[in-house]
Amino acid sequence: MRLQELPQYVAIDIKEALEERFMDSEAMYVRFLRKLLTTDDYRLMEEAAEAGNWQEVLRYAHNLMGVCATLGLTGLQTQFADIVSLLRSGDYTVPQLQAKLVAVKNDWQRTLQYIEELESA
């Protein structure tokens, strides 16, 4: 799959990411997108959630929110931001958090699947 096809499947702002953060280098941008395939933060966030360690969930969700913002992954950025806001507010139920984590998991997995299919720039 070509980079320019990615927005058909994933909420992503390629133009802004390329212009603002990757000096219009598609090769560098794709290289950084592919780094998502090897990050442990998402797995660690899931493990923390399973253990009920919401402070760790906050930490990893915040990290992932920043990474997604840098990469222009607007959909995932928004979902991680929602998790961060909910945890910071302290006004949440475990089922609310679990619902948000299930939603972000689906988008995370789908996004990684499409990133795996990217051709080198």
Language model features: what each stretch is:
Residues 1-59, 63-121:
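Two-component system phosphorelay core
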